[in-house]
């Protein structure tokens, strides 16, 4: 083992998995850590690591009376979000990465990365984190091992995934395949050099090698760049595995809706960021007798079941939510889960009594805070107290409304799939697709107007197919073909119905056309009644929308005319929309599925007859 005589922990490795041992040895030789620690996932280990992080200044321990066993971290201001421009899909063939991804030849990228990782863990501990996405006792568990030099990553991964000794034992016992996920902060320490609270490197690379199912992440300690089980594995690499193995890995929530008659239905829903995905996952219905429970708020893996049905599971163990806008008024269920503690907050503000705060958390703004950069803050300050992309990392088990089916390895049968964007005009409140392929067309053209939070021009349309634009691990046209192909593998009678929703439509005078939040349960109720063949709908060129009387408006100060306005299909608006879709589809070139081109042509014909 040559240079590894100084790494005695490798000799005492708690596994005999030859492939894993060889990889750990290779990484240790490359990165030169001072020591290796195999993560066991225990509470004792978590307590020790978080204690060390508090001593190092990386974590601040919160007031245990307010947030038990919870911590706040504050990142380098240059390390606050996913770095899409430095995220690469290095497929062997450039065509397989497609127009939505950055690409570099794998050999060239590996050479670059080896140069960056050489000696990158000097002076640090190398942590080996065995993890499984989803259930350890699933029929086909999806394993990963993350190597990192960040104890903050270890602590966060303990919340977000199933990690530790039990997972490693199963990887070893079954000689299982695992996704190797290598992460380094890129901040080696020379002997005697003082560390900083948030080590990182200005040169950041988040790289995926789809054919070999591997991930290399360098330079960032933040969220989706560093917790490699999340977007990197569960979406980018898993979407490629799903294509090859006949399933789907999607950026979706899963909810359970139970009617007054105690009949339950399961839905998944895809929304781009800032469109209310977590709020819908944790919905409090405003209609009597209907109940919502959640199975997940961000990632859904879907497989075809034994009877041709589409079954969904959530591969994650935690919530990694955007904090600003999550509040007692808008999402009390999320707040109740967070209030139980056992959470790590990143780039939020601190209250004077040792709690946390962010914009939108409470109606009243505290008179004084310490902002995410450590400055004294008052409501007169000209900058937000919490970073707009600040996060809470909380165990999903703390959600009171967590459905028991979350724990089932078989998952749940989906009755409906929702796609939703943020549009002031054009797109109705809710539209039922005519068919599976028509629903894929809706998903493929999903769009949102950019908000002030996004860089660039406000109000510009951003197409985001299935809300997966930053996460598709291969060519986007092939991805849409794969979605269409599911109908050929499934029982057509058991396929979920697809709906397009838009909670953000405005009236002519600029008000929201629909109250949203808990009242969105009324739209879900209509969708279920459509599936059951009970609710009335009006056929439009784009699909079926509710008849004015078909939405349950009990207790709302709305009329059937309001509903008719919220679902109106305007010919002029759609002429502009069709031109915009043409531009979008042109970007796919010859990888656009013929079936979607046919859907667009058919929609144009129907629209031509629409007054």
Swiss-Prot record:
<keyword id="KW-0479">Metal-binding</keyword>
<dbReference type="GO" id="GO:0019543">
    <property type="term" value="P:propionate catabolic process"/>
</dbReference>
<keyword id="KW-0342">GTP-binding</keyword>
<feature type="binding site">
    <location>
        <position position="422"/>
    </location>
    <ligand>
        <name>GTP</name>
    </ligand>
</feature>
<dbReference type="GO" id="GO:0030145">
    <property type="term" value="F:manganese ion binding"/>
</dbReference>
<dbReference type="GO" id="GO:0005829">
    <property type="term" value="C:cytosol"/>
</dbReference>
<feature type="binding site">
    <location>
        <position position="298"/>
    </location>
    <ligand>
        <name>Mn(2+)</name>
    </ligand>
</feature>
<dbReference type="Pfam" id="PF00821">
    <property type="entry name" value="PEPCK_GTP"/>
</dbReference>
<feature type="binding site">
    <location>
        <begin position="389"/>
        <end position="391"/>
    </location>
    <ligand>
        <name>substrate</name>
    </ligand>
</feature>
<keyword id="KW-0456">Lyase</keyword>
<keyword id="KW-0210">Decarboxylase</keyword>
<dbReference type="InterPro" id="IPR013035">
    <property type="entry name" value="PEP_carboxykinase_C"/>
</dbReference>
<dbReference type="InterPro" id="IPR008209">
    <property type="entry name" value="PEP_carboxykinase_GTP"/>
</dbReference>
<dbReference type="GO" id="GO:0006107">
    <property type="term" value="P:oxaloacetate metabolic process"/>
</dbReference>
<dbReference type="InterPro" id="IPR035077">
    <property type="entry name" value="PEP_carboxykinase_GTP_C"/>
</dbReference>
<protein>
    <recommendedName>
        <fullName>Phosphoenolpyruvate carboxykinase [GTP]</fullName>
        <ecNumber>4.1.1.32</ecNumber>
    </recommendedName>
</protein>
<dbReference type="GO" id="GO:0071333">
    <property type="term" value="P:cellular response to glucose stimulus"/>
</dbReference>
<dbReference type="InterPro" id="IPR035078">
    <property type="entry name" value="PEP_carboxykinase_GTP_N"/>
</dbReference>
<feature type="binding site">
    <location>
        <begin position="222"/>
        <end position="224"/>
    </location>
    <ligand>
        <name>substrate</name>
    </ligand>
</feature>
<keyword id="KW-0464">Manganese</keyword>
<dbReference type="GO" id="GO:0046327">
    <property type="term" value="P:glycerol biosynthetic process from pyruvate"/>
</dbReference>
<comment type="pathway">
    <text>Carbohydrate biosynthesis; gluconeogenesis.</text>
</comment>
<feature type="binding site">
    <location>
        <position position="273"/>
    </location>
    <ligand>
        <name>substrate</name>
    </ligand>
</feature>
<dbReference type="GO" id="GO:0005525">
    <property type="term" value="F:GTP binding"/>
</dbReference>
<feature type="binding site">
    <location>
        <begin position="274"/>
        <end position="279"/>
    </location>
    <ligand>
        <name>GTP</name>
    </ligand>
</feature>
<feature type="active site">
    <location>
        <position position="275"/>
    </location>
</feature>
<feature type="binding site">
    <location>
        <position position="251"/>
    </location>
    <ligand>
        <name>Mn(2+)</name>
    </ligand>
</feature>
<dbReference type="GO" id="GO:0004613">
    <property type="term" value="F:phosphoenolpyruvate carboxykinase (GTP) activity"/>
</dbReference>
<feature type="binding site">
    <location>
        <position position="231"/>
    </location>
    <ligand>
        <name>Mn(2+)</name>
    </ligand>
</feature>
<keyword id="KW-0312">Gluconeogenesis</keyword>
<dbReference type="Pfam" id="PF17297">
    <property type="entry name" value="PEPCK_N"/>
</dbReference>
<comment type="similarity">
    <text>Belongs to the phosphoenolpyruvate carboxykinase [GTP] family.</text>
</comment>
<comment type="function">
    <text>Catalyzes the conversion of oxaloacetate (OAA) to phosphoenolpyruvate (PEP), the rate-limiting step in the metabolic pathway that produces glucose from lactate and other precursors derived from the citric acid cycle.</text>
</comment>
<dbReference type="GO" id="GO:0033993">
    <property type="term" value="P:response to lipid"/>
</dbReference>
<dbReference type="GO" id="GO:0042594">
    <property type="term" value="P:response to starvation"/>
</dbReference>
<keyword id="KW-0963">Cytoplasm</keyword>
<feature type="binding site">
    <location>
        <position position="82"/>
    </location>
    <ligand>
        <name>substrate</name>
    </ligand>
</feature>
<dbReference type="InterPro" id="IPR018091">
    <property type="entry name" value="PEP_carboxykin_GTP_CS"/>
</dbReference>
<comment type="subunit">
    <text>Monomer.</text>
</comment>
<keyword id="KW-0547">Nucleotide-binding</keyword>
<feature type="binding site">
    <location>
        <begin position="517"/>
        <end position="520"/>
    </location>
    <ligand>
        <name>GTP</name>
    </ligand>
</feature>
<dbReference type="GO" id="GO:0006094">
    <property type="term" value="P:gluconeogenesis"/>
</dbReference>
